[in-house]
């Protein structure tokens, strides 16, 4: 349960703005200074979900959508404790590619649309929350509240989230590894040379443009070899071989 606020520039003066949604429960939509507005959710398609048409004004500057996700959201992967390496705490990770971000955020879910964002998350205090963005924490806090910023325009499928019993170990000034405590030592050894790899690449192709480059080692149920989420690659634990290959 939460909300998303879209800051917009209504260049054409349209009175209808269309968002992509897929099996989301929409509570209400408001414009600018909390002004309620009408919305209509169109016909459902198994792949694309539904168009959500929101009534706006030519002068509208923001559209805020209050909503909740569903247990069957295709982008949200919920794992029970026994499905994790540590076996003690549940785990959540998202996978937005190709058009699944609309199953957890009402948005214009196409690669043509590049967005920046700020996000605030509230999670249980015994878990750590990460996003593919700036300001990722390196340790849990007692409030379980975290804030993030992505100031480089990205397609919506690269909005990524992970929540679990995670710890961090730096591998360089701008690189590090997040993993379950039982995997952290092995993961840190495996990726210890990432900072040097970046430096070599920069000597050939120019400066790395994204600030930090961290790696999150996910549970074995992660269905990809890796996902190129900006600033925080999501990686399968099967690449931890012990020989840095």
Language model: regions and residue ranges:
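A short, structured loop/turn motif at beta-sheet edges
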Residues: 12-14, 56-62, 125-126, 140-143
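N-terminal, polar/Ser/Thr-rich
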Residues: 1, 32, 79, 85-91, ...
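Aromatic-lined ligand-binding clefts that engage carbohydrates, nucleic acids, or primary amines
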Residues: 15-24
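Hydrophobic beta-strand positions in extracellular immunoglobulin-like domains
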Residues: 6-8, 67, 104, 121
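Aromatic/His-enriched, Gly/Pro-containing loop or helix-boundary segments
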Residues: 37-58, 93-102, 236-245
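Hydrophobic helix-coil surface modules that form long, contiguous segments used
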Residues: 2, 95-99, 107-245
């Amino acid at each position: 349960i939460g909300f998303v606020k879209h800051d917009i520039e209504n260049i054409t003066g349209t009175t209808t703005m269309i968002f992509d949604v897929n099996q989301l429960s929409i509570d209400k939509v408001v414009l600018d200074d909390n002004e309620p507005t009408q919305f209509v959710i169109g016909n459902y398609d198994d792949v694309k979900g539904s168009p959500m048409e929101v009534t706006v004004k030519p002068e509208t500057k923001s559209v805020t959508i209050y909503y909740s996700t569903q247990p069957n959201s295709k982008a949200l992967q919920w794992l029970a404790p026994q499905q994790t390496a540590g076996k003690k705490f549940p785990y959540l990770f998202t996978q937005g590619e190709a058009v699944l971000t609309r199953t957890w955020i009402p948005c214009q879910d196409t690669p043509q649309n590049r967005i920046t964002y700020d996000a605030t998350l509230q999670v249980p205090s015994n878990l750590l929350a990460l996003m593919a963005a700036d300001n990722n924490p390196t340790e849990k806090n007692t409030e379980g509240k975290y804030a993030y910023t992505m100031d480089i325009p990205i397609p919506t499928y690269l909005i990524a989230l992970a929540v679990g019993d995670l710890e961090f170990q730096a591998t360089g000034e701008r690189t590090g590894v997040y993993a379950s405590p039982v995997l952290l030592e092995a993961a840190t050894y495996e990726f210890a040379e990432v900072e040097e790899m970046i430096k070599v690449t920069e000597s050939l192709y120019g400066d790395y443009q994204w600030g930090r480059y961290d790696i999150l080692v996910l549970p074995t149920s992660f269905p990809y070899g890796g996902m190129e989420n900006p600033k925080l690659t999501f990686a399968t634990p099967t690449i931890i071989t012990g020989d840095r290959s």
